[in-house]
């Protein structure tokens, strides 16, 4: 996509509701082109590319906290507070895989001295805080989080379906025009490029 209209699409959809306080775009590598996904998921975790309602800060009830899984923790607290989230699949973000870029948590949390793929990064050989990540989230939400193993590594597991029965509240003055609004975007065929090996990148986490 070569336009910022995707942000406007997500913002306008989120603004249809009074109680959707958190939304964002899914990762492109979680939605490969050969798979089918709904345009959005309701009441689930939102990672990295996040739109937050300012009033959750003004009220003082929701804020960033902790060192690990901050976005998952905040997503859970939003939903447990009676609010709603949307994770968009119609619009995706091309997040760089964890540990492949310096800065952020690469050094402080993951212990990586030189960012890169799993084949050429430096440092962190004995560093695997995955269980600590999972235990930290479990301590914050023992009612919702299970510690499990997936693909031979420690992970947290959350059943988000418990939050998905209640529908968000549309604004009383909401008027959605008939027809399709493409926000000025056009679908065009681009020149062939060499795509990233998505599954290879997923393996670096």
Where are the regions that the model predicts?
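Conserved catalytic core of nucleotide-sugar-dependent glycosyltransferases
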Residues: 2-73, 80
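C-terminal catalytic/acceptor-binding lobe
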Residues: 66-205
């Amino acid at each position: 996509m070569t336009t910022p209209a995707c942000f406007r699409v997500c913002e306008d959809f989120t603004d249809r509701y009074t109680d959707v306080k958190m939304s964002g775009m899914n990762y492109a590598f979680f939605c490969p082109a050969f798979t089918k996904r709904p345009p959005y998921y309701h009441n689930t975790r939102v990672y990295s590319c996040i739109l937050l309602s300012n009033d959750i800060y003004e009220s003082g009830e929701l804020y960033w906290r902790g060192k690990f899984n901050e976005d998952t923790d905040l997503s859970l607290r939003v939903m447990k507070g009676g609010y709603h989230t949307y994770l968009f699949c119609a619009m995706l973000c091309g997040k760089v895989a964890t540990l492949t870029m310096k800065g952020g948590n690469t050094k402080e949390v993951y212990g990586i001295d030189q960012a890169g793929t799993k084949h050429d990064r430096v440092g962190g050989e004995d560093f695997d805080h995955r269980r600590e990540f999972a235990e930290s989230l479990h301590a914050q939400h023992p009612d919702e989080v299970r510690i499990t193993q997936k693909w031979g590594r420690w992970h947290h597991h959350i059943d988000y379906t418990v939050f998905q029965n209640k529908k968000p509240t549309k604004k009383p003055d909401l008027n959605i025009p008939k027809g399709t609004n493409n926000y000025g975007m056009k679908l065009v065929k681009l020149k062939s490029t060499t795509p990233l090996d998505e599954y290879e990148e997923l393996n670096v986490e």
